[in-house]
């Protein structure tokens, strides 16, 4: 055996062609070493005898060494190449598109009547919007770069660029996410969600309509769409999605969450338009209307004019989204029974659930009666969060971990600041006057002229991150021109006031509820904008078509 091993190792390590020694096969019988060696075979009998232990060890060592040498010579080990580190920075093409947009507009000659600062800020603002749409970086990072560019170019001072971080609306939105954390953490969200599923959960459409009309019923009592969306309905909708197996990031968003989030958002702008007290900026519209046409828009007048087109929109929009952006789970006849089993398993409310429920009732009560008590919406939300922090229902570390809240606060405040200074620098006033001169010079009937003004007023909202800012900048000018062209003043004022809410559905920053529902991350940005534009057309057709007939019936024109 030693000879076979040795010869094998030699042939492996040193392949000889013509000079290799061929050993004869040993006889099958056992060898007798005492007999004389008479043949050639016997001369090699020593090779067939057992080797001493020391020699066998050396032979084994030689075999291993020769094998190592052979393998090394036949297939050399390649050098270790470190795995390439993936690029962690911005997506290059979207970044270049954003920069190119800003540079092109920056070097376009400034129109007459526009200041250089206003034009530069418009270039930075549009570049930021393109960046927010294409997302070379997260939204907060893009918005922060936009603010940095405005400060670097001396377009805005640092104080002006970051002034909107003192605005209450971005903070109210961030606080809404903290409330949602407590709502879900305590289990109260699941409890309420299971109750909804038990009552309406046999179909996704029924579940959606139950939320839509619940929000509409609360709208006249809570004069902040941000508070309604963030403090009450976002936590509830998120809990419903999770309870139905629709989660962010695991491919189940379309089971229910995508459709439900988009539906609740789009209908929140409809309910905001239906009542004078349903949105914080609605009284501003009424006040500006009185200053312009000297006619008062009362709560009853507003509701009477808006109720019919509003109800039609609340019915049509969820069903339309159900058809074009459907949930994959449409029917679940066993859901009510399963929800009841879950409720039975949960048992009575825990201490933290009771604290969360009491805090929510306190906050909502202050949102409803806060105007009489001198407490605004964001102050009420801070008070509610303070209760949750003191009682340990929510911890500050958990608030810090809500990255979506801080990201939303950053980009929303940045857009509010830039859009606000576009108005302060006179760009919006210049645009309004230009539109007024153009439409007034067309010589059209008041119906056609008003239709053009309505569309321009509506779709310029892409440049605004606040309904109040849009109303303050353009409402008076467009109402004045409309009446000058023959539009009935009271009719024009109400239509512009209604549209001042509906236009918030265009983007993820156009109204207070937009960043809240978008921040849940169930709907991609491109779809959010695409469906926002589509629903805007539907709403305009309903409010000017069905609404126009209703307003004719009640004598507004």
Swiss-Prot record:
Query: What's a BP term from Gene Ontology annotated to this protein?
Result: alpha-ketoglutarate transport
**Keyword annotations:** Chloroplast, Membrane, Plastid, Plastid inner membrane, Transit peptide, Transmembrane, Transmembrane helix, Transport
Give the knockout phenotype.
Reduced growth and amino acid levels, but growth inhibition is prevented when mutant plants are grown under non-photorespiratory high CO(2) conditions.
Q: Which Pfam families match?
A: Na_sulph_symp
Keyword Phosphoprotein: yes or no?
no
What induces the gene encoding this protein?
By nitrate after two days of nitrogen deprivation and re-illumination after three days of dark adaptation.
**The protein's name in its UniProt record:** Dicarboxylate transporter 1, chloroplastic
Species source reads Arabidopsis thaliana
UniProt membrane topology term = Multi-pass membrane protein
State the compartments where it is located.
Answer: Plastid, Chloroplast inner membrane
List the record's Gene Ontology CC terms alphabetically.
chloroplast; chloroplast envelope; chloroplast inner membrane; chloroplast thylakoid; plastid
> Which family would the database say this protein is a member of?
Belongs to the SLC13A/DASS transporter (TC 2.A.47) family. DIT1 subfamily.
UniProt-listed PANTHER family: DICARBOXYLATE TRANSPORTER 2.1, CHLOROPLASTIC
Positions of transmembrane segments: 90-110, 122-142, 158-178, 229-249, 256-276, 305-325, 355-375, 376-396, 411-431, 438-458, 477-497, 531-551
